[in-house]
Amino acid sequence: MERREPTQKALVLAGGGARGSYQVGVWRALMELDWHPQIITGTSVGGLNGAMFVLDLYETARDMWLTIRSRDVMELPEENADLSALHQFLRRVVKEGGMDVTPLEEIVERVLDEDALRAAPIRFGIVTVEQRGLRPRELTLEDIPAGQVRDYLMASAACFPALRARQIDGVKFLDGGYSDNMPTGLAKTMGAEELVCVDLEGVGITRPNLTGLPTTMIRSYWELGDILHFDPDTAKRNMELGYYDTLRAFGRIRGCAYAVDSGADSSADAEAFRAAFDAVQKEVREKYPVTLTAAAALLLARMKDAQLAPLEAAAEDAGVDPTHFYTTRTLAQAFLTACDKERMESFTPLFTGSSTAGQAALAALLPNTFLQALVWHTLTASALPEVTEDEGL
């Protein structure tokens, strides 16, 4: 029997500045899933992360993202600068064509070994753009002259006009996001047969994926922060989101906004919760049709897991932390702990049939809050026995 060559897998890393910490969480999950790419392509911060991934520098990447701040990446005005000093700084930035990124360049110089990158078994490619004429350049390591890999990585991340264009051999280059912020086409050109794409919803041009290749898209439900605000706490949060989103994309957990156990017990609880929720909602809707706005709010929520959708939407509105792993029960408990109980109890007459027209109208005017109340009543009416505010996570 003829031996079949393994599928050529590619990891495609989009640009997105400080949101790049999310990709480190994705990488952690891919390692746990034993998913190893033969090709990595990236734009901007995706290229910088991708180079570290090629070199198997997970701990280095993680520790870097957990310590850097904006001042470690680019030149900024003094924190306590007066208005005059701030104006002077801004004038200089405009005159010089963007902020100086020497601090970032020093990090890249310290972390990335060009010889090791070229010797690595994973093929690597990046995207940048020539400033003159906005000519796109898709470059593999073989296309980049010896000694210039760091220069081209910095060019791919030159987010002009906020950051300065990168000059290489007399040619000025800009961030690859000016051409292709998610270089799927480059991955296919390099021989990819299967893609995992990590989208940061950054600025720039994200072209449609026209490769025709099997593609797993990983994208956060949650906001990942400003693209030029580097902060360890945000980075830590983004890493957790990236980790769980990847496990979800590969079918290891369920949920949409939250990471929820997909095991038999948790799934049975999700089914029981949704059945009880639907019964409560149907009863209230028949008595007070005006409360249909809560159903509309649920339909508008970006939830793909139907059984968990009401609980996830309510948990989001109540401010439940999305960076933990939950079962259906512990997510319910977290919601009960986080919600405004006095506000929830104010809707009780709607569930007991003793509501006034004014209370029903209030529920209609506050569909998200009333959706929380529906979930709260469903849970406190023992849809999931033994779920209490004291149950540990």
Model region roles, listed by residue range:
Residues 1-43, 51-393:
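Patatin-like phospholipase
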